[in-house]
Amino acid sequence: MKITKITTYRLPPRWMFLKIETDEGVVGWGEPVIEGRARTVEAAVHELGDYLIGQDPSRINDLWQVMYRAGFYRGGPILMSAIAGIDQALWDIKGKVLNSPVWQLMGGLVRDKIKAYSWVGGDRPANVIDGIKILREIGFDTFKLNGCEELGLIDNSRAVDAAVNTVAQIREAFGNQIEFGLDFHGRVSAPMAKVLIKELEPYRPLFIEEPVLAEQAEYYPKLAAQTHIPLAAGERMFSRFDFKRVLEAGGISILQPDLSHAGGITECYKIAGMAEAYDVTLAPHCPLGPIALAACLHIDFVSYNAVLQEQSMGIHYNKGAELLDFVKNKEDFSMVGGFFKPLTKPGLGVEIDEAKVIEFSKNAPDWRNPLWRHEDNSVAEW
C-alpha cells in the first residue's frame, strides 16, 4: 500500500480536516490545525506531504521521524500541528486495514469509560450559572470556565474581586454537587497569579489551567508550592521535549497535551507515559472538532493516568458548525452520565461526511482570536 494524495479542508468554526488517500482505496482522516493559523498549518502539511507520497502508510513511526527530523529546523506549533494531523490519519488507515480501533492496536483498554467536561461561557455569574444548569440536565457534573478577564501585569483589587466573585457565586449556587476548573488562559502575570490563586483557594476549583504562559513555566513549581489547587498546563507545549522540562521542574499536576498540536497520537502516547512516571495525570486539551476528539479518546483509553477529557460540544467558538456536524456515526460519540465510551469502529472510529466537508470548506472563515488591549492601550493577553 502506498500514499497517493493528501487533501486539506479548512472548515467552520475554526477547524481543518486532512484526508490521506492510498492506492488500495483506504482513506485516513486527521485534524491538523492551530486555531487562528489554519492557512499556515495547511502550507506545512503540504510541505511535509513531499516526504509522504509514495510511502507505505503502515510505517507510522518511521514517517513520524522523517517529518520531525528530516528538517534541520523543527518543532513549534505549526510544524507539530501539521505532523499531528498526518499522524492521526495514518493511525486511522492502519486501524481500517487491520479492522481494529486504534486503542486495540495500542495494547487494549485500561478503562471502560472516561469522564468528559464541558466548557461554560458567559460574561456574568448569572449566565454561567444558567449554562451549568442546562448542562447538568444532560448529564455533566464537571465544567471549565474562564478564571478571569484580562488582567494588568499588576492590577487592582477590584479586578481580583470581580474574578473571585464569579467563582464564589457558582460554588454557592451548586455547593459540592459540581466540579469546575478555572482557565487563566495565560492572561495572568506571575505576580497576579500568586494573588488570584490565593483568593480562589477557598472555593476549591478542580484545577487552574495555564496559571501563567508556558513561556513562564519556571513559575509553575513556585505557584504550586503556595496552593493546594492542582495546576494544569500543556496546550501550548508541542513535543515530549517541551513536556520533559515541565515534568522535571515539577509543579504541574495535570498535563493537557493537544492531540492536534503536539505531534498526534504517536507523540502524545509518549507524553502520557512520561507523565505517568512522574505521577502526573492527563487531561487532553480538545476545544476542536470530532477527529481531534477521537484521537484524544484513543489515548485516554490506553493511558492509565488519563482522568478527564475536554470536548467542544456547545462551546462558544462553534459558530457555523457544531462538534458532530461532519460526522455520520454521531451515536458513537454519545455520552452517558457525562462519560464517553470507547469508539469501536476500525481506525479512529469517525465516519466523516465527506460531501458535507467539501461543501462547507468552500466558505470557511479565517478565524482569528480577538485582540485585547489594556486601559493604557498596550496589548493584553487573550
UniProtKB/Swiss-Prot annotation:
Enzyme class: lyase
BP GO annotations: amino acid catabolic process; D-galactonate catabolic process
Residues marked Increases basicity of active site His (site): D258
Pathway: Carbohydrate acid metabolism; D-galactonate degradation; D-glyceraldehyde 3-phosphate and pyruvate from D-galactonate: step 1/3
EC numbers, comma separated: 4.2.1.6
Names of the cofactor(s): Mg(2+)
Catalytic machinery residues: H185 (proton donor), H285 (proton acceptor)
Cofactor: how bound: Binds 1 Mg(2+) ion per subunit.
Record-level Gene Ontology MF annotations: galactonate dehydratase activity; magnesium ion binding
Listed CDD domains: D-galactonate_dehydratase
Listed InterPro entries: DgoD-like, Enolase-like_C_sf, Enolase-like_N, Enolase_C-like, Galactonate_deHydtase, Mandel_Rmase/mucon_lact_enz_CS, Mandelate_racemase_C, Mandelate_racemase_N_dom
Reaction(s) catalysed by this chain's protein: D-galactonate = 2-dehydro-3-deoxy-D-galactonate + H2O
Keyword annotations: Lyase, Magnesium, Metal-binding
Pfam annotation, one family: MR_MLE_C
Chain positions of site Transition state stabilizer: E310
Chain residues that bind Mg(2+): D183, E209, E235
Note: Reaction proceeds via an anti dehydration.
PANTHER family, alphabetized: D-GALACTONATE DEHYDRATASE, D-GALACTONATE DEHYDRATASE-RELATED
Function, as annotated: Catalyzes the dehydration of D-galactonate to 2-keto-3-deoxy-D-galactonate.
Family: Belongs to the mandelate racemase/muconate lactonizing enzyme family. GalD subfamily.
Official protein name in the record: D-galactonate dehydratase 1
Originating species: Escherichia coli (strain SMS-3-5 / SECEC)
Source lineage: Bacteria, Pseudomonadati, Pseudomonadota, Gammaproteobacteria, Enterobacterales
